[in-house]
């Protein structure tokens, strides 16, 4: 997972690495700069680690990538990778689509807006969600001890 792929891992919501995955920013060893991905790498792992990887053109294994926060989980085998992926996708299906999108949008606003305005906006979004169709369905499903409609019948 080099260059642009490394950048994609840094902007992903959930990243799972296989047992043989290698990550790196080889651009400087190729005579170019990691212009498009550098801001995302810094945001994901911090300036000092991004400098170390980029300025030395380092390649790291999946465990180091997990330690740095580039990926969230590592698999010891290809079979475990498939299991972790299936589990993550199953968890996604258990979450309401609109609530998930609104949550992601809220999280991306943190650090870019004043906290007071962000909290006010979040409270408004929460109230809308409670009154909305997903909030109603989720509450009813919980009370009736069943899966919400968006979760499907596959499990």
What are these model-predicted stretches?
Residues 2, 34, 47, 135:
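Functionally critical, cavity-lining and gating residues within the transmembrane helices
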Residues 39-48:
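Hydrophobic, secondary-structure "cap" segments at the distal end of domains
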Residues 44, 56, 129:
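Conserved catalytic core of Hanks-type protein kinase domains
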Residues 16-21, 71-120, 124, 149-155:
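C-terminal long alpha-helix characteristic of the crotonase
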Residues 1-30, 59-62:
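Glycine-rich beta-to-alpha active-site loop
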